[in-house]
Amino acid sequence: MHLFYTPDIEGDIYTLNADESRHCVRVLRLGAGEAVSLVDGKGTWYEGVIERAEVRGCEIRITDRRELY
C-alpha cells in the first residue's frame, strides 16, 4: 500500500495536490478503487480508496482514521 503525506486533511474526501496526484497516477500507476494510506504529520493515520484518479487532482475517500500518538 502507498503512503501520502497530507497535512491539511479534513472530511471524508481528500484531493491530493497536483504534484502528489501526478506521482500517484503517472509514476505509481494507481487508479480508481485502489487502497492508499495517508498521514497528516500530527499523529493520525488514514486509510482510503481512490475515487477519481486524475493527474491534476486525485480524489481519495477516507475509510478509516486512527490516532497513533
Model segments located where?
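Acidic/glycine-rich phosphate/pyrophosphate-binding loops and surrounding catalytic core
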Residues: 1-69
